[in-house]
Regions:
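Multi-pass alpha-helical transporter architecture, strongest
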Residues: 180-204
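Juxtamembrane intracellular "pre-TM" segments in multi-pass secondary transporters
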Residues: 1-20
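Residue-level signature of mid-helix packing/kink "hotspots" within the transmembrane helices
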Residues: 59-67, 157
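Transmembrane alpha-helical cores of Major Facilitator Superfamily
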Residues: 24, 56, 60, 116, ...
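A late C-terminal transmembrane helix in Major Facilitator Superfamily
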Residues: 129-172, 177-178
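Helix-to-loop junctions at the C-terminal end of transmembrane segments
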Residues: 65-80
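Extracytoplasmic gate region of multi-pass secondary transporters
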Residues: 14-58, 62
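C-terminal transmembrane helical hairpin of 12-TM major facilitator-type secondary transporters
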Residues: 80-129
Length: 204
């Protein structure tokens, strides 16, 4: 009964539901990388020995942005910071989609640079998306967090599984997958974004 009541309360809040979905799509984008990274670096690039170091090195990018998030969120606010990071995530992914459409794989340095920047953006997205989703439902934080995690995972795993099967001969499908997940998340975010209050006109 408590869980049912909490679930009903959860879906009453538009922003909570919306940012739970965006968390799912962004997590799905990351899982695309996780599921395909070994195949990409070892089979497509032949970097069997170097793969563990590249994998670990890319994680530093997420750690750095997660660390910086605590400072920057005080300056810009959760929503603005998340919007800036998501816009950058989408823009860079779209750029790579266009640059490498019907082209051979980019050099490993170019690929690692792409992933580093994308992961840097992710560090700002995960925490802020979840915080925004939980903000209206602090009174049911436990149940809310459970529903948020469950729904976002249910969204993320099929996305990663579907997109990952196309990453066979080139990394281009991964660029497309990240761009699509980012754009859907951006669309949802803009859809529920609260309009800024219009300043009153001064008399005179």
């Amino acid at each position: 009964r408590v869980f049912l009541t909490g679930s009903i309360e959860f879906i009453k809040h538009r922003e909570t539901v919306a940012f739970t979905f965006t968390s799912g799509f962004i997590t799905g984008a990351f899982l695309v990388y996780l599921s395909a990274s070994q195949h990409v670096f070892e089979d497509q690039y032949g970097m069997v020995e170097s793969f563990p170091y590249i994998f670990a090195g890319l994680a530093v990018s997420i750690g750095l942005s997660t660390f910086l998030n605590g400072t920057l969120v005080m300056k810009f606010g959760m929503r603005k910071l998340a919007l800036m990071a998501l816009s950058a995530f989408c823009g860079i992914a779209l750029l790579y989609v266009l640059l490498f459409w019907n082209q051979p794989n980019p050099s490993v340095a170019v690929l690692v640079a792409f992933l580093s920047v994308q992961f840097f953006c992710l560090g700002f997205l995960w925490g802020n998306f979840r915080s925004i989703a939980m903000e209206p439902i602090g009174h049911i934080a436990g149940i809310g967090a459970a529903i948020n995690g469950f729904v976002s995972t249910v969204i993320a795993v099929p996305i990663a599984s579907y997109i990952g099967q196309f990453v066979t001969d080139t990394v281009w499908p991964m660029f497309v997958g990240l761009a699509v997940c980012g754009l859907i998340s951006l669309g949802i975010m803009l859809l529920v974004r609260k309009p800024r209050p219009i300043a009153s006109l001064s008399k005179g």
